[in-house]
Swiss-Prot record:
Protein name per Swiss-Prot or TrEMBL: Large ribosomal subunit protein bL9
Gene: rplI
Its job: Binds to the 23S rRNA.
GO biological process, one term: translation
Assigned GO CC terms: ribonucleoprotein complex; ribosome
Disulfide bridge map: none
Single annotated GO MF: structural constituent of ribosome
Top-level taxon of the source organism: Bacteria
A Pfam match: Ribosomal_L9_N
Family membership: Belongs to the bacterial ribosomal protein bL9 family.
InterPro entries per the UniProt record, alphabetical: Ribosomal_bL9 (IPR000244), Ribosomal_bL9/RNase_H1_N (IPR009027), Ribosomal_bL9_bac/chp (IPR020594), Ribosomal_bL9_C (IPR020069), Ribosomal_bL9_C_sf (IPR036791), Ribosomal_bL9_N (IPR020070), Ribosomal_bL9_N_sf (IPR036935)
Entry keyword DNA-binding: no
Keywords per UniProt: Ribonucleoprotein, Ribosomal protein, RNA-binding, rRNA-binding
Amino acid sequence: MKQQLLLLEDVDGLGRSGDIVTARPGYVRNYLLPQKKAIIAGAGTLRLQAKLKEERLLRAAEDRAESEKLAELLKDLVLEFQVRVDPDNNMYGSVTISDIIAEAAKKNVILTRKNFPNAHYAIKNLGKKSVPLKLKEGVTATLFVEVSSESAYIAVLNQQSSQEQTVAAEELE
């Protein structure tokens, strides 16, 4: 027989903080109650439920504002990766979620694995890719990732340095 519970925290697949839900006894006994994620619903829990819903609404508004701000920041951000390639321009390895998170952190953008709806996402081709992100409170964003070969990157640096040398030589004359 399922039990009625008042959730104290958001629980994936069950409900949000302040919701009264039903769950199987084993799940309740072994997970929800020991982790203090829920209490058994009774007559006295209605006041607590109202308080939890009010807190959840305030937190949801803050999370939505923060997520929209982050989505606006991500709209203009392009993460660049230089990778090793073979002569046929096939990448050695791939650009993974961990690489994207680390590169974003260097640009003061905090992302976690939870932000990536496709948990096994990896970029295996050169070029500019769009990566879908799921932020808090249903806000979605797109992050752009540009993957180029190290040899192309080195060629651009060499071209820039040769141009600088040409300018320096002209200045000496």
